[in-house]
Regions:
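12-transmembrane solute porter fold
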Residues: 2-18, 23-27, 34-48, 53, ...
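Transmembrane-helix exit segments and adjacent C-terminal regions of multi-pass membrane proteins
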Residues: 5, 365-447
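Helix-breaking motifs and short loop linkers at transmembrane-helix boundaries and internal kinks
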Residues: 33-35, 67, 85-94, 105, ...
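Paired small-residue
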Residues: 81-85, 93-102, 195, 277-285
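Cytoplasmic helix-loop-helix junction between adjacent transmembrane helices
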Residues: 100-134
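Glycine-rich segments within core transmembrane alpha-helices of 12-TM secondary carriers
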Residues: 125-143, 318-327
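Helix-loop-helix hairpin linking two adjacent transmembrane segments in secondary transporters
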Residues: 130-172
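C-terminal membrane-cytosol helix-exit motif in multi-pass small-molecule transporters
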Residues: 162-183, 434-443
Length: 447
């Protein structure tokens, strides 16, 4: 058990930070299962990040005067219990409430695990383990959530977290760590925390909007979408060895990372077609940028600053408030762009149906079925397969109808890809703003 203590604490950190985006690929399934609206289901994602961002600093302040292992164990237990509650939720209101409690327990767990890892490994190794676990969790969240949703259900996302968290409770209690009694000697590091917030807002476009495009826009399964977005965590993990090999100055490393994220998001905005292959290179750029920036900025925000736990709280708050800001900026944009794309898409659909080599009666029947599907799926990229599946066509008409369905799907995929373009470009702009905070001259102070 003693050897497993450190890894269990690191896994807990990764689980909590993965939860900021782990449900992204499951949102369509949650939408259908709980019979709710798009606006409400978005709060499954927003509520967790908002609560975690708001409570991280106050909890860190209180934590500085508390017994780390006791409060860590309580936080991990609350996180485990609320994860089970999420899995059992039968309404959107209950799920959102459970996510809020999960974030509260997660904040306690995150702050506590930092102190416990430092007590176990020493300050340098402990902070490094905490930061690395957070980056891994952030990068792998959508990938893991998509695979679990495809293989089992959206509830499985929360079920699998429970045993890991339960095992981490005795692991937390096993570490002897005294409260950090350092005086409040340093102000929060504004620049790295601001850069973290802006990058988190920008990464929302890659970790949230991209998977939404793959599942809702291009109608791929959550499993295939998860495998596709696995490029981001793989590239992020590869960034650290590359940085150690090249050993660039910290400011250069972060600046390059911001530029890579911006470039990757521009690449996603300019996809030439709805082919998964075209997303790989932009995702690799985003992943490399993520790996070069988030852990470095987190370390800079905490470096030589006491009390350590409080400055860790500021980094947690910056990252998750940044996610909420990113969602608040980008969601209305791509929603409006989807609505603007509806009329041109409907006109293109009508033109394709009229030009199809089908009998007039079959064209009318298919057009009516398509009209019903478009009405029922208003406000989202429609799946038109059911309209063709229910059509009563003669065998000789089936090949032409199948070709028409393929043409319509291609038209809708092009429309969806264009509808997400502005949001990806805004995400790139946020990454460039983060770059400006890195390269802007530091104000000199005199002591």
């Amino acid at each position: 058990m003693r050897r497993a203590v450190g890894p269990l604490l690191a896994v807990t950190v990764a689980l909590v930070l993965a939860d900021s985006a782990v449900v992204t690929l499951a949102l369509p399934d949650i939408l259908r299962h709980l019979d709710t609206s798009v606006g409400q289901v978005a709060w499954v994602l927003i509520s967790f990040n908002l609560v975690l961002g708001l409570v991280a600093v106050p909890i860190a302040v209180v934590f500085g005067r508390a017994q780390p292992r006791f409060f860590s164990a309580v936080g991990i237990a609350v996180f485990a219990g609320s994860s089970a509650w999420c899995a059992l939720a039968q309404s959107i209101e209950v799920l959102i409430a459970a996510r809020c409690v999960q974030a509260l327990g997660g904040a306690l767990a995150l702050v506590g695990c930092l102190e416990l890892l430092v007590a176990k490994y020493g300050a340098r190794r402990g902070v490094a383990a905490w930061v690395t676990a957070g980056v891994v969790g952030t990068a792998t969240g959508p990938f893991a959530g998509g695979l679990l949703t495809q293989a089992f259900s959206w509830q499985a996302i929360f079920v699998v977290q429970v045993p890991f968290a339960v095992l981490a409770v005795p692991a937390a209690l096993a570490v002897r760590a005294a409260p950090e009694l350092s005086p409040d000697r340093h102000r929060p590091a504004v620049r790295p925390n601001l850069t973290l917030a802006l990058l988190s807002a920008a990464l929302t476009a890659a970790l949230f909007l991209l998977v939404l495009l793959l599942v809702e826009g291009w109608h791929h399964s959550p499993g295939l979408a998860a495998l596709t977005v696995s490029v981001v965590p793989v590239a992020a993990l590869g960034a650290r060895p590359l940085a150690r090999l090249l050993q660039p100055p910290a400011q250069v490393e972060v600046a390059v990372g911001c530029f890579l994220i911006a470039g990757g998001l521009v690449g996603l905005a300019l996809l030439p077609s709805a082919d998964l292959v075209w997303t790989i290179a932009p995702q690799a750029l985003v992943g490399l940028g993520l790996g070069l920036t988030v852990d470095r900025l987190t370390s800079q925000a905490m470096e030589m600053r006491l009390p350590r736990v409080r400055h860790a709280g500021w980094t947690i708050s910056a990252r998750h408030i940044g996610v909420v800001v990113g969602l608040a900026i980008l969601t209305p944009v791509f929603t409006a762009d989807l609505q603007d794309a509806e009329v041109p898409a409907q006109e293109a659909i009508a033109s394709l149906v009229l030009d199809a080599p089908l009998k007039p009666d079959d064209k009318i029947a298919i057009a009516q079925s398509l009209g019903r599907e478009l009405t029922q799926q208003q406000g989202q990229v429609p799946d038109l397969h059911r309209a063709f599946e229910t059509a009563d066509l003669a065998p000789e008409e089936r090949p032409a109808a199948a070709q028409l369905e393929r043409d319509l799907d291609e038209q809708l995929e092009r429309a969806a890809t264009r509808a997400f373009r502005d949001s990806f470009l805004i995400g790139a702009g946020l990454a460039l703003l983060a770059l400006l905070t890195v390269v802007a001259p530091h104000r000199k102070t005199t002591s």
